[in-house]
């Protein structure tokens, strides 16, 4: 299949998650909403259910969620709750709500209260000190509890063999997405910022085996494609999420292609595979989480060395990017607290960057357009 045809298929999925949810429900499958961050989707997949990403939405008018949310909650949390309240996500059979930040922690209880008569809400508490034996055991126990709740929803046991099989499916998918990011950097003429974001976003709304099969086909076509002409600029993007239509249009208009990303919604979520040489599936998933790093949401035992900021700087250099765009989610405390150290490292490495505030309620992207245009001209 041609590259353009494959991209069009991903665009259809990305543009209409509700259609995908309805499709899977029509097949008799149950679906579980997975909120940010680091949900062990393998457990949902192993249960024979469909994991559906719930990371807010763009431009929805908040009405009912304001009754539950403080004004300083990020719009990812508010928009996710709004969709649950207004019926957009009524097809879900439950949701998993991790609590890795100070907004999601109290928000998990808002989800529980708001959804008490509609669907089960599964609480997931990851440990911050996750690398040692106690941290891995904590993660194991937390995942085991999630597994029990999922078994209540699906109506049968989630076997260890099913989890091990799911890990293989997900590792294959993560590898395909990492390869796609590499190929997108090699073909900015074929994969502009909006297309790259669309292809990666589609993973949240498809069963991973189906998604990976289609993505591997796209990767094969990209690998065989000749190098094209690109007269724009390559950049690295960093932040929680940035795929608002206005932002992506502004990047495409100013010929800013993405060489690599340091985003929670994208590469951070598929950077680490689960080991396949362990006999216990839950243990393998706990080990996987223990190896997650370079994320503002996670405790870094080597924080004094500013390892995360150095990681971002190295990402810019190794990808061949000319600069960095920091997309700062409004009211995201971890991102805001990290920025001074990140800026210091970027300046020390003489890496041009621009910081742009993003919000899922934004309707006028004129300010972002101007900032991106000025940044492109400065490169």
UniProtKB/Swiss-Prot annotation:
Q: Which Pfam families match?
A: HGD-D
Q: Where in the cell is it found?
A: Cytoplasm
Provide the E.C. number(s) assigned to this enzyme. Answer: 4.2.1.167
Per its UniProt record, the required cofactor names are:
[4Fe-4S] cluster; FMN; Mg(2+)
Q: Which InterPro entries match?
A: FldB/FldC_alpha/beta
One of its GO biological process terms is: glutamate catabolic process via 2-hydroxyglutarate
Uppermost EC category: lyase
Q: Which GO terms describe its molecular function?
A: 2-hydroxyglutaryl-CoA dehydratase activity; 4 iron, 4 sulfur cluster binding; metal ion binding
What's noted on cofactor binding?
Binds 1 [4Fe-4S] cluster per heterodimer. Binds 1 FMN per heterodimer.
The catalytic activity, as recorded, is: (R)-2-hydroxyglutaryl-CoA = (2E)-glutaconyl-CoA + H2O
A single GO cellular-component term from the record reads: cytoplasm
The UniProt activity regulation field reads:
Activated by the HgdC. Reversibly inactivated by oxidants such as 2-nitrophenol, 3-nitrophenol, 4-nitrophenol, 4-nitrobenzoate, carbonyl cyanide 4-(trifluoromethoxy)phenylhydrazone (FCCP) and chloramphenicol. Irreversibly inactivated by oxidants such as hydroxylamine and nitrite.
Pathway as given in its UniProt record: Amino-acid degradation; L-glutamate degradation via hydroxyglutarate pathway; crotonoyl-CoA from L-glutamate: step 4/5
Q: What does the record give as the function of this protein?
A: Involved in the fermentation of L-glutamate via the hydroxyglutarate pathway. Catalyzes the reversible syn-elimination of water from (R)-2-hydroxyglutaryl-CoA to yield (E)-glutaconyl-CoA. The dehydration mechanism involves a transient one electron reduction of the thioester from (R)-2-hydroxyglutaryl-CoA, generating a ketyl radical. Prior to (E)-glutaconyl-CoA formation, the ketyl radical is subsequently reoxidized by electron transfer back to the HgdA-HgdB complex (CompD) to avoid change in oxidation state of the substrate.
Question: Family assignment?
Answer: Belongs to the FldB/FldC dehydratase alpha/beta subunit family.
The record describes its quaternary structure and partners as: The (R)-2-hydroxyglutaryl-CoA dehydratase enzyme system is a heterodimer composed of an alpha subunit (HgdA) and a beta subunit (HgdB).
Name this polypeptide is given: (R)-2-hydroxyglutaryl-CoA dehydratase, subunit beta
Q: Which gene encodes it?
A: hgdB
């Amino acid at each position: 299949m041609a590259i353009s045809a494959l991209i069009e298929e991903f665009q259809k999925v990305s543009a209409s998650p509700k259609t995908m949810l309805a499709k899977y429900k029509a097949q008799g499958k149950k679906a579980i909403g997975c909120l940010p961050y680091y949900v062990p989707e393998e457990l949902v997949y192993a249960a024979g259910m469909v994991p559906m990403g719930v990371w807010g939405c763009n431009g929805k008018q908040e009405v009912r969620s304001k009754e539950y949310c403080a004004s300083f909650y990020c719009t990812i949390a508010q928009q996710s709750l709004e969709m649950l309240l207004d019926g957009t996500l009524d097809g879900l059979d439950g949701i998993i709500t991790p609590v890795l930040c100070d907004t999601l922690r109290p928000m998990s209880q808002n989800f529980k209260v708001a959804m008490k008569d509609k669907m089960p809400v599964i609480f997931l508490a990851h440990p911050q000190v996750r690398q040692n034996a106690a941290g891995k055991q904590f993660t194991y126990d937390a995942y085991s509890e999630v597994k029990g709740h999922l078994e209540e929803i699906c109506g049968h046991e989630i076997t260890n063999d099913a989890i091990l099989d799911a890990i293989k499916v997900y590792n294959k998918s993560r590898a395909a997405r990492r390869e796609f990011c590499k190929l997108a950097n090699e073909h900015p003429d074929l994969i502009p910022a909006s297309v790259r974001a669309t292809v990666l976003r589609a993973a949240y709304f498809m069963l991973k085996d189906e998604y990976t099969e289609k993505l591997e086909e796209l990767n094969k076509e990209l690998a065989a494609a000749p190098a094209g002409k690109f007269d724009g600029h390559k950049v690295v993007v960093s932040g929680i999420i940035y795929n608002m239509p206005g932002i992506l249009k502004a990047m495409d208009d100013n010929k800013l292609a993405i060489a690599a990303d340091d985003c929670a919604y994208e590469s951070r979520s598929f950077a680490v595979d689960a080991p396949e040489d362990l006999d216990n599936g839950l243990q393998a998933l706990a080990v996987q989480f223990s190896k997650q790093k370079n994320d503002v949401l996670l405790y870094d035992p080597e924080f004094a060395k500013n390892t995360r900021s150095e990681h971002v700087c190295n990402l810019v250099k190794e990808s061949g990017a000319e600069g960095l765009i920091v997309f700062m989610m409004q009211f995201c405390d971890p991102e805001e607290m990290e920025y001074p150290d990140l800026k210091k490292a970027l300046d020390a490495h003489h890496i041009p960057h621009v910081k742009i505030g993003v919000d899922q309620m934004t309707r006028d992207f004129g300010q972002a357009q101007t900032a991106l245009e000025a940044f492109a001209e400065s490169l």
